[in-house]
Design a protein with these regions (language model features):
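Pocket-edge positions in alpha/beta enzyme catalytic cores
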Residues: 12, 41, 196, 242-245
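Short, highly charged low-complexity linear segments
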Residues: 129-131, 210, 215-218, 242-243, ...
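Hydrophobic alpha-helix feature that most strongly marks membrane-spanning transmembrane helices
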Residues: 164, 189, 213-216
Length: 274
Protein backbone atom coordinates (compact mmCIF):
# COMPACT_ATOMS: atom_id res chain seq x y z
CA UNK A 1 0.00 0.00 0.00
CA UNK A 2 2.84 2.42 0.79
CA UNK A 3 4.08 2.29 -2.80
CA UNK A 4 0.61 3.15 -4.09
CA UNK A 5 0.25 6.00 -1.59
CA UNK A 6 3.48 7.54 -2.88
CA UNK A 7 2.24 7.49 -6.47
CA UNK A 8 3.94 4.37 -7.77
CA UNK A 9 2.20 2.11 -10.24
CA UNK A 10 1.77 -1.14 -8.31
CA UNK A 11 1.15 -4.61 -9.71
CA UNK A 12 -0.12 -7.12 -7.16
CA UNK A 13 1.15 -10.40 -8.59
CA UNK A 14 -0.72 -13.11 -6.70
CA UNK A 15 -1.77 -16.74 -7.05
CA UNK A 16 -5.06 -16.24 -5.22
CA UNK A 17 -7.02 -13.75 -7.29
CA UNK A 18 -9.74 -13.36 -4.67
CA UNK A 19 -7.19 -12.17 -2.13
CA UNK A 20 -5.53 -9.99 -4.75
CA UNK A 21 -8.83 -8.33 -5.64
CA UNK A 22 -9.65 -7.78 -1.98
CA UNK A 23 -6.26 -6.14 -1.44
CA UNK A 24 -6.75 -3.95 -4.50
CA UNK A 25 -10.18 -2.84 -3.29
CA UNK A 26 -8.82 -1.99 0.17
CA UNK A 27 -6.11 0.16 -1.37
CA UNK A 28 -8.53 1.96 -3.67
CA UNK A 29 -11.02 2.51 -0.86
CA UNK A 30 -8.40 4.36 1.17
CA UNK A 31 -6.58 5.93 -1.77
CA UNK A 32 -8.86 6.33 -4.81
CA UNK A 33 -6.04 7.94 -6.79
CA UNK A 34 -3.82 4.84 -6.45
CA UNK A 35 -2.56 3.24 -9.66
CA UNK A 36 -2.79 -0.45 -8.86
CA UNK A 37 -3.80 -3.63 -10.67
CA UNK A 38 -3.55 -7.38 -10.22
CA UNK A 39 -1.69 -10.05 -12.15
CA UNK A 40 -2.24 -13.78 -11.81
CA UNK A 41 1.04 -15.39 -10.76
CA UNK A 42 1.62 -18.93 -9.49
CA UNK A 43 5.22 -19.44 -8.40
CA UNK A 44 4.52 -23.14 -7.95
CA UNK A 45 4.07 -23.60 -11.71
CA UNK A 46 7.01 -22.69 -13.94
CA UNK A 47 5.00 -22.55 -17.17
CA UNK A 48 2.31 -20.33 -15.67
CA UNK A 49 5.01 -18.18 -14.09
CA UNK A 50 6.65 -17.59 -17.48
CA UNK A 51 3.30 -16.65 -19.02
CA UNK A 52 2.65 -14.14 -16.23
CA UNK A 53 6.09 -12.58 -16.68
CA UNK A 54 5.53 -12.27 -20.43
CA UNK A 55 2.11 -10.69 -19.85
CA UNK A 56 3.59 -8.16 -17.45
CA UNK A 57 6.43 -7.19 -19.77
CA UNK A 58 4.08 -6.82 -22.72
CA UNK A 59 1.97 -4.31 -20.79
CA UNK A 60 4.76 -2.17 -19.26
CA UNK A 61 7.86 -0.34 -20.43
CA UNK A 62 10.12 -1.23 -17.51
CA UNK A 63 10.20 -2.40 -13.90
CA UNK A 64 11.65 -0.23 -11.12
CA UNK A 65 11.32 -2.57 -8.14
CA UNK A 66 10.76 -6.31 -7.92
CA UNK A 67 9.88 -7.61 -4.46
CA UNK A 68 10.16 -11.38 -4.23
CA UNK A 69 7.76 -11.74 -1.34
CA UNK A 70 5.61 -14.80 -2.05
CA UNK A 71 5.95 -17.49 0.56
CA UNK A 72 4.74 -20.85 1.81
CA UNK A 73 5.47 -21.73 5.43
CA UNK A 74 5.35 -25.21 7.02
CA UNK A 75 2.35 -26.55 5.06
CA UNK A 76 1.35 -30.21 4.96
CA UNK A 77 3.57 -32.22 2.63
CA UNK A 78 2.93 -31.22 -0.97
CA UNK A 79 4.66 -30.59 -4.28
CA UNK A 80 4.54 -27.93 -6.97
CA UNK A 81 3.17 -28.48 -10.47
CA UNK A 82 6.73 -29.35 -11.50
CA UNK A 83 7.21 -31.93 -8.75
CA UNK A 84 9.35 -29.85 -6.37
CA UNK A 85 8.88 -29.84 -2.61
CA UNK A 86 6.37 -27.03 -2.15
CA UNK A 87 8.42 -24.66 0.03
CA UNK A 88 11.72 -24.95 -1.84
CA UNK A 89 9.86 -24.94 -5.15
CA UNK A 90 7.77 -21.86 -4.40
CA UNK A 91 9.90 -19.76 -2.08
CA UNK A 92 13.21 -20.24 -3.87
CA UNK A 93 12.87 -21.78 -7.33
CA UNK A 94 9.77 -19.75 -8.21
CA UNK A 95 11.50 -16.49 -7.34
CA UNK A 96 14.70 -17.61 -9.07
CA UNK A 97 12.81 -18.22 -12.33
CA UNK A 98 10.66 -15.09 -12.06
CA UNK A 99 13.68 -12.86 -11.48
CA UNK A 100 15.43 -14.31 -14.51
CA UNK A 101 12.43 -13.64 -16.74
CA UNK A 102 12.04 -10.05 -15.50
CA UNK A 103 15.72 -9.08 -15.43
CA UNK A 104 15.74 -7.43 -18.90
CA UNK A 105 12.76 -5.28 -17.86
CA UNK A 106 14.52 -4.20 -14.67
CA UNK A 107 17.61 -3.18 -16.62
CA UNK A 108 15.48 -0.63 -18.51
CA UNK A 109 14.74 1.32 -15.30
CA UNK A 110 16.93 4.16 -14.05
CA UNK A 111 17.56 2.92 -10.49
CA UNK A 112 16.15 -0.61 -10.33
CA UNK A 113 16.18 -2.80 -7.25
CA UNK A 114 15.31 -6.38 -6.45
CA UNK A 115 14.41 -7.28 -2.86
CA UNK A 116 14.22 -10.97 -2.03
CA UNK A 117 12.47 -11.75 1.23
CA UNK A 118 14.06 -14.26 3.59
CA UNK A 119 13.39 -15.00 7.27
CA UNK A 120 15.04 -15.20 10.67
CA UNK A 121 14.45 -18.94 10.15
CA UNK A 122 17.22 -18.99 7.53
CA UNK A 123 19.66 -19.56 10.39
CA UNK A 124 18.31 -23.09 10.85
CA UNK A 125 18.43 -23.86 7.13
CA UNK A 126 20.83 -26.40 5.65
CA UNK A 127 21.45 -26.99 1.97
CA UNK A 128 21.60 -30.68 1.07
CA UNK A 129 22.50 -30.61 -2.60
CA UNK A 130 22.24 -34.38 -2.89
CA UNK A 131 18.56 -34.24 -1.87
CA UNK A 132 17.19 -30.70 -1.66
CA UNK A 133 13.59 -31.88 -1.94
CA UNK A 134 13.92 -34.47 0.83
CA UNK A 135 12.84 -37.37 -1.35
CA UNK A 136 12.64 -40.70 0.43
CA UNK A 137 12.90 -39.08 3.86
CA UNK A 138 10.38 -38.26 6.57
CA UNK A 139 8.93 -34.86 5.73
CA UNK A 140 10.54 -32.12 7.81
CA UNK A 141 8.41 -29.06 7.14
CA UNK A 142 10.50 -26.74 9.33
CA UNK A 143 13.71 -28.02 7.75
CA UNK A 144 12.40 -27.31 4.26
CA UNK A 145 11.18 -23.87 5.30
CA UNK A 146 14.59 -23.00 6.74
CA UNK A 147 16.27 -24.34 3.61
CA UNK A 148 14.03 -22.30 1.32
CA UNK A 149 14.64 -19.05 3.21
CA UNK A 150 18.39 -19.70 3.36
CA UNK A 151 18.30 -20.28 -0.39
CA UNK A 152 16.43 -16.98 -0.84
CA UNK A 153 19.09 -15.05 1.05
CA UNK A 154 21.97 -16.78 -0.74
CA UNK A 155 20.30 -16.15 -4.09
CA UNK A 156 19.81 -12.45 -3.37
CA UNK A 157 23.44 -12.03 -2.33
CA UNK A 158 24.83 -14.02 -5.26
CA UNK A 159 22.59 -12.16 -7.70
CA UNK A 160 24.01 -8.84 -6.53
CA UNK A 161 27.56 -10.11 -7.01
CA UNK A 162 26.75 -11.22 -10.55
CA UNK A 163 24.97 -7.97 -11.38
CA UNK A 164 27.93 -5.93 -10.19
CA UNK A 165 30.32 -8.13 -12.17
CA UNK A 166 28.22 -7.55 -15.30
CA UNK A 167 28.21 -3.78 -14.78
CA UNK A 168 24.45 -3.60 -14.27
CA UNK A 169 22.66 -0.73 -12.56
CA UNK A 170 20.33 -3.22 -10.85
CA UNK A 171 20.87 -3.67 -7.10
CA UNK A 172 19.84 -6.89 -5.36
CA UNK A 173 19.09 -6.67 -1.64
CA UNK A 174 17.36 -8.90 0.90
CA UNK A 175 15.08 -8.37 3.86
CA UNK A 176 12.93 -10.15 6.40
CA UNK A 177 9.79 -9.09 8.31
CA UNK A 178 10.74 -10.42 11.74
CA UNK A 179 7.86 -11.95 13.65
CA UNK A 180 4.85 -10.50 11.84
CA UNK A 181 1.19 -11.35 12.21
CA UNK A 182 0.33 -12.56 8.71
CA UNK A 183 -1.46 -15.59 7.28
CA UNK A 184 1.90 -17.01 6.16
CA UNK A 185 2.23 -18.66 9.57
CA UNK A 186 -1.30 -20.05 9.68
CA UNK A 187 0.01 -23.65 9.90
CA UNK A 188 2.18 -22.80 12.92
CA UNK A 189 1.14 -23.48 16.53
CA UNK A 190 3.44 -20.63 17.58
CA UNK A 191 1.40 -18.20 15.46
CA UNK A 192 -1.83 -19.28 17.13
CA UNK A 193 -0.27 -18.83 20.56
CA UNK A 194 1.69 -15.61 20.07
CA UNK A 195 0.15 -13.72 17.16
CA UNK A 196 -1.20 -11.07 19.53
CA UNK A 197 2.35 -9.89 20.29
CA UNK A 198 3.59 -10.10 16.71
CA UNK A 199 4.33 -7.09 14.53
CA UNK A 200 1.48 -5.87 12.39
CA UNK A 201 1.72 -6.74 8.71
CA UNK A 202 2.57 -3.11 7.89
CA UNK A 203 5.36 -2.99 10.48
CA UNK A 204 6.68 -6.30 9.20
CA UNK A 205 6.80 -4.83 5.71
CA UNK A 206 8.88 -1.85 6.85
CA UNK A 207 12.33 -3.47 6.38
CA UNK A 208 11.30 -4.66 2.92
CA UNK A 209 10.13 -1.17 1.94
CA UNK A 210 13.34 0.28 3.36
CA UNK A 211 15.45 -2.07 1.25
CA UNK A 212 13.37 -1.28 -1.83
CA UNK A 213 13.48 2.52 -1.60
CA UNK A 214 15.95 4.09 0.80
CA UNK A 215 19.41 5.24 -0.36
CA UNK A 216 20.80 4.16 3.01
CA UNK A 217 19.77 0.56 2.32
CA UNK A 218 22.62 0.28 -0.16
CA UNK A 219 25.04 0.21 2.79
CA UNK A 220 24.06 -3.33 3.83
CA UNK A 221 22.71 -6.33 1.89
CA UNK A 222 20.13 -7.60 4.40
CA UNK A 223 17.51 -5.70 6.42
CA UNK A 224 15.07 -6.66 9.16
CA UNK A 225 13.61 -5.44 12.45
CA UNK A 226 16.38 -3.99 14.60
CA UNK A 227 14.84 -4.81 17.98
CA UNK A 228 14.91 -7.84 20.32
CA UNK A 229 15.77 -11.17 18.65
CA UNK A 230 15.55 -9.41 15.26
CA UNK A 231 11.82 -10.15 15.49
CA UNK A 232 10.48 -6.74 16.54
CA UNK A 233 11.40 -3.10 15.99
CA UNK A 234 12.06 -0.70 13.15
CA UNK A 235 14.35 -1.54 10.21
CA UNK A 236 17.98 -2.22 10.93
CA UNK A 237 20.90 -4.14 9.52
CA UNK A 238 20.07 -7.84 9.82
CA UNK A 239 22.48 -10.58 10.76
CA UNK A 240 23.28 -13.30 8.24
CA UNK A 241 24.31 -16.84 9.13
CA UNK A 242 27.73 -18.08 8.09
CA UNK A 243 26.04 -20.47 5.66
CA UNK A 244 24.28 -17.57 3.94
CA UNK A 245 27.57 -15.87 3.09
CA UNK A 246 29.31 -18.99 1.73
CA UNK A 247 30.10 -17.93 -1.84
CA UNK A 248 31.06 -21.41 -3.04
CA UNK A 249 27.75 -22.85 -1.86
CA UNK A 250 25.94 -19.89 -3.43
CA UNK A 251 27.46 -20.77 -6.80
CA UNK A 252 26.46 -24.42 -6.31
CA UNK A 253 22.93 -23.34 -5.41
CA UNK A 254 22.76 -21.21 -8.55
CA UNK A 255 23.84 -24.12 -10.76
CA UNK A 256 21.42 -26.50 -9.00
CA UNK A 257 18.58 -24.00 -9.44
CA UNK A 258 19.30 -23.64 -13.15
CA UNK A 259 19.13 -27.42 -13.47
CA UNK A 260 15.80 -27.52 -11.65
CA UNK A 261 14.07 -24.75 -13.64
CA UNK A 262 15.47 -26.01 -16.93
CA UNK A 263 17.23 -22.92 -18.26
CA UNK A 264 20.42 -20.93 -17.71
CA UNK A 265 20.13 -17.80 -15.58
CA UNK A 266 23.07 -16.10 -17.29
CA UNK A 267 23.06 -12.53 -16.03
CA UNK A 268 25.12 -10.87 -18.82
CA UNK A 269 23.03 -12.53 -21.55
CA UNK A 270 19.73 -11.55 -19.94
CA UNK A 271 20.87 -7.96 -19.42
CA UNK A 272 21.68 -7.72 -23.13
CA UNK A 273 18.13 -8.63 -24.16
CA UNK A 274 15.93 -5.80 -25.39
Amino acid sequence: MEFAVKGAEVVLACRNQTKATNALERIRARHPEAIVRTLGLDLANLNALKQAADEFMASTSHLDVLINNAGVMIPPKSTTADGFELQVGTNHLGHFALTAHLLPHLEKASEPRIVTVSSIAHTMGRLRFENMHGEGRRYDKWGHYGRSTLANLMFGLELDRRLKSAGSRIVSLCGHPGYANTSLQRHSLMWRLFNNVALSASRGAAPILYAATEPGALNHPYWGPGGPLAAWGWPGQARMSRAATNKEDARRLWAWSEEQVGFAFDVPSLLALD
